[in-house]
Amino acid sequence: MHFKKVGKLATEATAFYGPLREFSDSQVERINFALIHALHDFMPDDVVTAVFEHGGKGHPLILGVANNRVYAFDVPQPPGENEPVVQVRWRSYRLDPEHCEVHAELSYTRPNPAFGQEVNRRTRWRFRIHDLEFDLPTRVHAESDGVEPREELAQSLAKSLGVIPASETDVKSLREVA
């Protein structure tokens, strides 16, 4: 994976370890360095990616989807202040509907032109891919030009598993309904 994209993902992930989490700059830099190299070495170039909290402990999970595979990266145990080694856990799973589940809770906001509201959808995607389970909360706005990375990743996963048609969840379909 290209270093520019890798650097952006690693920086987004290490933001979870910021000052509120009582990690020093040195610890965060070591985590960032390890993630950059793990992503560069083990994440394919043509991947759809997102970073989000996982496991309810404030730890980031970096996920990628490409070629019917899911790639997951995390730091299971952040290093201590004087520990030079950072362990990055890398997992790769084949997207097999027999070993995967997708659930979604959807809520829609009806537009109200008087208040400038637009149609939007909030979704809490829940995935189980072999032994990896995670939630992806997302939001889609009808007036938005793009899709947030977490929504793009969730759609890519659901489409790869064949549980939703390719056109059912995109922003264009929200605009057409409005």
Model-assigned labels for residue ranges:
Residues 10-15, 34, 38, 50, ...:
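A sequence-composition feature that detects small, non-aromatic residues
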Residues 1-63, 67:
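Anionic N-terminal interaction surfaces
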Residues 4-6, 89, 178:
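Generic extreme N-terminus detector
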Residues 51-122, 133, 160:
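Phosphoinositide-binding peripheral membrane targeting modules
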Residues 101-177:
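Canonical pleckstrin homology
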